[in-house]
Design a protein with these regions (language model features):
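Low-complexity, intrinsically disordered short peptide segments enriched in small/polar/basic residues
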Residues: 15-20, 41, 295, 307
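Residue-level detector of alpha-helical transmembrane segments in integral membrane proteins
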Residues: 19, 76, 280-283
Length: 350
């Protein structure tokens, strides 16, 4: 009976719902095997949490999804071959994430599937862009409150790089570091493999329930009320704020969460859009498929401004007319910050 159980590799889940492979019994001659520490185990075995002979190690018996293992393997190889500047940045990210207020279980996951090891290797790419490609300048990080907050910003650039750069600013430069939870579009998890990856790096589908749960855990949520309207607008409408949705304000009122307005200057010029190819967008169930003059972003210089927190009181179930007045206050603050940033910058690229 035990042999049948081992052969079928029955899967189980822990309290967070993360699948965990069951651990097979050791071989008969396991007692005679020579011990081998995880530190000297082959990189493939370490990546999948395996000990000598391909068995799950005692230190990490919870071997997770193969995607996580492949990500760890690739990250380990790249880290060993990387120049010193990348290795140093990787260590900096590890230290900063260790200091960030995150609620992780004993397996290293939070309730929404975030894994800091996977996230760190992904953030490393964005950190390189942050420091050396977009050369981001962040202002007003001292305005970030402790505990829960809603970061609300303008959205642009055809590709959601602006969200990544805002997130890198709060991880690399805020004191203490803050890991922002991105509220993704509903269609994103429908992309093959992306749903698991999105969860591992901290992304969450932007449902009201997900947002409320995260805020109740005193975490920081970033949202863009313009949505696709802002991100995919033509170049001729750059830095013109589009209509804001009202959902973020209702969430702020429901959870008594301060709103931090954020203005990004530099994102509008990174990709030049001349239109949308909607037939292809519909084919992939995407809200838009922009036609760009450049599909790799230009090295524009990012300026990110964090404003003072805005607090609102009221009934989250009020009529739209009441909520819109509060939304317009946030939109107006962001508009003023954008205009001030445009006046202050000397060049698009420097």
């Amino acid at each position: 009976m035990a042999t049948k159980t081992h052969k079928s590799s029955a899967r189980r889940t822990n309290k967070t719902g993360i699948p965990v492979r069951s651990i097979p019994p050791p071989p008969a001659d396991a007692s005679a095997a020579t011990p081998q520490s995880d530190a000297h185990a082959p990189v493939i075995e370490r990546a999948f949490g395996l000990g000598p002979g391909g068995l799950p190690s005692e230190r990490e018996p919870h071997s997770v999804e193969r995607l996580d293992g492949l990500h760890s393997l690739a990250g380990g190889i790249l880290e060993s071959l990387a120049p010193r500047v990348i290795r140093d940045l990787n260590h900096e990210l590890r230290d900063r994430l260790d200091k960030a207020p995150l609620e992780l279980n004993s397996y290293g996951y939070d309730p929404w599937g975030l894994n800091c090891d996977v996230a760190r290797r992904t953030l490393l790419v964005f950190a390189l862009f942050y420091k050396y490609y977009f050369r981001v300048k962040a202002y007003g990080l001292e305005n970030l409150p402790k505990g829960r907050m809603l970061i609300i910003g303008n959205h642009a650039g055809q590709i959601a790089i602006d969200a990544s750069m805002i997130g890198m600013a709060t991880v690399l430069e805020a004191d203490p570091p803050r890991f922002l939870r991105g509220m993704g579009e509903y269609w994103l998890p429908t992309l093959p493999f992306f749903n698991v990856f999105m969860a591992r790096v901290g992304g969450v589908v932007g449902t009201p329930k997900n947002c409320v749960d995260i805020l109740h855990h005193e975490e920081a949520v970033i949202a863009f009320p313009e949505g696709v309207r802002g991100m995919n607008k033509p170049f001729s409408e750059r830095y013109q704020l589009q209509e804001f949705g009202n959902g973020f304000m209702r969430l702020a009122l429901q959870t008594n969460t301060p709103i931090v307005p954020v203005a990004v200057v530099g994102s509008e010029e990174q990709a030049i859009s001349i239109g949308n190819f909607m037939p292809l967008a519909r084919l992939f169930s995407m809200p838009a498929f922009p036609i760009l003059l450049n599909y790799f972003p230009l090295p524009t210089r990012y300026h990110i401004y964090f404003g003072e927190p805005m607090e609102f009181r009221g009934n989250p179930n009020d009529e739209d007319e009441v909520i819109v007045k509060k939304v317009e206050q946030v939109k107006g603050r962001i508009h003023d910050m954008i205009q001030r940033g445009l006046r202050q910058r000397r060049s698009i690229f420097f």
